[in-house]
Amino acid sequence: MTKEQIIEAVKNMTVLELNELVKAIEEEFGVTAAAPVVVAGGAAAGAEAAAEKTEFDVILADAGAQKIKVIKVVREITGLGLKEAKDLVDNTPKPIKEGIAKEEAEEIKAALEEAGAKVEIK
């Protein structure tokens, strides 16, 4: 029996049949299908994680008085169209970029602040 045939057979099973199959596999091979549980570390582990943060979010807190300049910068950074960039700038606070490197986040923050916006990096 090929993998494809096994997958096709599983696709055609009911939930009850799948449950029985899982139990049979657990008994046959001595394993469990339970998801692994991650134990939370103490305060020291939390401090290490905070110190090692590698991904940052750039949040536009306020567009300031020169919205047109800010919209232009947002369009350059995100590649959004005019309407989407304007909606983003008009509805602050909003994330501009998420999950980026610290250097890139700092560059984006500097460009937006130069245009008159208030920016946060989280």
Curated annotation (Swiss-Prot):
Q: Which domain of life is it from?
A: Bacteria
Q: Which InterPro entries does the entry mention? A: Ribosomal_bL12 (IPR000206), Ribosomal_bL12_C (IPR013823), Ribosomal_bL12_C/ClpS-like (IPR014719), Ribosomal_bL12_oligo (IPR008932), Ribosomal_bL12_oligo_N_sf (IPR036235)
Please list the GO biological process terms of this entry.
translation
Arranged from A to Z, the UniProt key words for this protein are:
Ribonucleoprotein, Ribosomal protein
Per the record's keyword annotation, is Hydrolase included, yes or no?
no
Q: Name one GO molecular function term.
A: mRNA binding
Q: Which GO terms describe its cellular component?
A: cytosolic large ribosomal subunit
User: By its UniProt entry, which PANTHER family does this protein fall under?
Assistant: 39S RIBOSOMAL PROTEIN L12 (PTHR45987), LARGE RIBOSOMAL SUBUNIT PROTEIN BL12M (PTHR45987:SF4)
What does it do?
Forms part of the ribosomal stalk which helps the ribosome interact with GTP-bound translation factors. Is thus essential for accurate translation.
Stated family: Belongs to the bacterial ribosomal protein bL12 family.
Subunit composition and interactions:
Homodimer. Part of the 50S ribosomal subunit; present in 4 copies per ribosome. Forms part of the ribosomal stalk which helps the ribosome interact with GTP-bound translation factors. Forms a pentameric L10(L12)2(L12)2 complex, where L10 forms an elongated spine to which 2 L12 dimers bind in a sequential fashion.
Name of this protein: Large ribosomal subunit protein bL12
